[in-house]
Amino acid sequence: MKEVDMNKQVAYWINGFGRAYKRIATPGRVGEPDVSGCVLGIRIEIEGKLPGNKPTPMQFKKLEWWKQAGAITGWYCTFREAQEIVINGLIQHAEGIDEKRKAKILAICKRFKK
């Protein structure tokens, strides 16, 4: 599988959360994460790599910048790794927020963890 195909799969999975926004990076945007999204107001910025590869120093820097801004971040080599990053990040963000929104986030995670 090509990296772009894996990223599309991840982006469309994020879009399936409902009330989600996703974008796949376009060429020429140096260092920007491959997949960007927002689920229930929680920003997601993740980088996809083929197995055996890792992000460039610039990509690591951008991921850290987004993390400091409060986004769910990480990098993955498989679809399953991407799912774990997003679901674990959503669960972490659910702590300390109002109960109604927390219930929505946890319900989404339960639905998509399968």
Language-model segments: residues:
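Catalytic phosphate/metal-binding cores of nucleic-acid and nucleotide-processing enzymes, i.e., regions
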Residues: M1-K114
